[in-house]
Amino acid sequence: VAKIGIIGLNGAGKSTLLKIIAGIDKQYQGEVVFSPGYSVGYLEQDPKLDPSKTVKEIVQEGVQPVLDLLKEFDQVNESFADPDVLEDPDKMDKLINRQAELQDKLDAADAWNIDNKLERAMDALRCPPEDQNVATLSGGERRRVALCRLLLQNPDILLLDEPTNHLDAESIDWLEQHLQQYPGTVICITHDR
């Protein structure tokens, strides 16, 4: 686990370096290699967000795998009322086993508190109201929403291009504490400490 700061003059290529590490910029000589299974998350200076979505929908993308598990868990539970399942012990056993697998995954992901987790993250970063359409957000508000989504994804390697831009002092303090405790690697370009 490393916390790395990239410093340099304007135009020196700091943002380009992060894009290369993130796999976005392919116009270079050399090779970036990650161990298999590592996830990389990248916050660019001007995040591209789907303008047709709400703030909450964008933030939820950060925990989409957990939301998908919850949806499947609900579908499995609804299947217990299916007459075909009730009459077939093999189908019932398969359903019970799948329910147990999903329950274990959901417990491990603390999925039962996902709404609270989303709300806390959005509050900490002073995100706009959850029902606000992304198309109406300012550049700074879009960055807050994108940062919130990225932090909820919890990637192994976090690439941050000036993450404190457009954040107030309280949000910067929260972010600094969060990054100090972050369990993965953080590579950051910033003009703050």
Residues covered by each model-derived region:
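ABC ATP-binding cassette signature C-motif
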Residues: 1-193
